[in-house]
């Protein structure tokens, strides 16, 4: 009988930015790569599962009910040889398991999370990582955090970096109307620090550079609009909300630079997406961003609008060098490699 590997794909269709991108791109690359395995994805949105992966629908209104009752019941029925989860194991699951942990921001700086989320993540993620057969992390930083903050044995942790989708390249449509813009990619929330981006734009003075935000509003949209109004920048700050893959690729191509002011990141996919698109990157020295940038970006201190404004000026002035360095860096990451290394983890447990 063909071994069954079940992948929890609950992030699909939920606009969970980096987590959804990880699951979607991993499934796309896994499809067709392992004819010796039966790969199945459990999700609320089976229509988003790519061909080559078996889609198993699991409607759920509440995450707690899903993880404590519905998913355990389904897994008892399916009896997979390996099950792959994001962040946490479902209640009572004891079969061979893989957990991907994207970051430990809830331990590194919990002030960016609500009290409820802080309690949930601190209760479930470290415990799940210690119980899992293998833990996949996307950066060396998260590996160090799991060892030091969660007590996970190093020999059970496998670093498998994220990749860059082929749609991110200089070739293709651009989003521009002749007015230059810096692009900010990510949800509007405190940890991503969109307000520092607006403050940095204000410090650049009365030029024509705009700031375009692409990502869902997770609570800071109103504050961003208020900051723009306070500085008289209403016509130079645009909030696009969640955008499609194709629109995001076009936004990268048309941008003068990527601005990534985050206070903490376990990886930082937009850095590589911008680099692959031929766009200079200005990012903070926060979390894993220096590790992922690999010397191919302008790095500034988080929460410092003065440094951010200076970084933008340097990126625009040194565009040619940064674009060339970015291409070299982005070529070191691919979702195909992510899938192959993930399959190797599955096969260790069969």
Short names for language-model regions:
Residues 1-350:
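Carbohydrate transferase catalytic cores enriched for Leloir-type hexosyltransferases
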């Amino acid at each position: 009988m063909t071994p069954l590997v079940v992948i929890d794909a609950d992030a699909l269709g939920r606009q969970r930015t980096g987590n959804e991108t990880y699951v979607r791109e991993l499934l796309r690359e896994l499809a067709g790569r392992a004819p010796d395995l039966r790969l199945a994805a459990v999700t609320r949105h089976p229509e988003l599962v790519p061909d080559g992966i078996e889609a198993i629908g699991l409607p759920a209104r509440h995450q707690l009910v899903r993880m404590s009752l519905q998913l355990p019941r389904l897994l008892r029925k399916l009896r997979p040889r390996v099950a792959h989860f994001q962040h946490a194991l479902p209640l009572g699951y004891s079969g061979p398991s893989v957990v991907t942990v994207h970051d430990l921001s809830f331990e590194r700086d919990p002030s960016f999370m609500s009290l409820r989320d802080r309690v949930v993540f601190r209760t479930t993620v470290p415990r799940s990582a210690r119980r899992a057969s293998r833990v996949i992390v996307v950066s060396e930083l998260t590996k160090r955090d799991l060892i030091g903050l969660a007590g996970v044995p190093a020999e059970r942790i496998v670093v498998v970096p994220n990749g860059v989708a082929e749609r991110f390249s200089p070739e293709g449509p651009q989003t521009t109307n002749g007015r230059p813009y810096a692009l900010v990619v990510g949800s509007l929330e405190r940890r991503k620090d969109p307000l520092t981006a607006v403050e940095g734009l204000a410090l650049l003075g009365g030029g024509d550079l705009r700031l375009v935000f692409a990502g869902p509003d997770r609570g800071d949209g109103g504050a961003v609009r208020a900051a723009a109004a306070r500085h008289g920048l209403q016509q130079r700050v645009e909030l696009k909300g969640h955008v499609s893959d194709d629109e995001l690729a076009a936004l990268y191509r048309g941008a003068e630079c990527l601005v990534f002011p985050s206070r903490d990141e376990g990886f930082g996919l937009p850095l590589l997406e911008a680099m692959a698109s031929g766009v200079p990157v200005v990012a903070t020295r926060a979390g894993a961003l220096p590790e992922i940038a690999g010397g191919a970006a302008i790095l500034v201190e988080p929460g410092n609008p003065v440094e951010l404004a200076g970084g933008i000026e340097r990126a625009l002035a040194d565009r040619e060098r940064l674009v060339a360095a970015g291409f070299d860096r982005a070529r070191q990451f691919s979702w195909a490699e992510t899938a192959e290394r993930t399959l190797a983890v599955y096969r260790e447990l069969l």
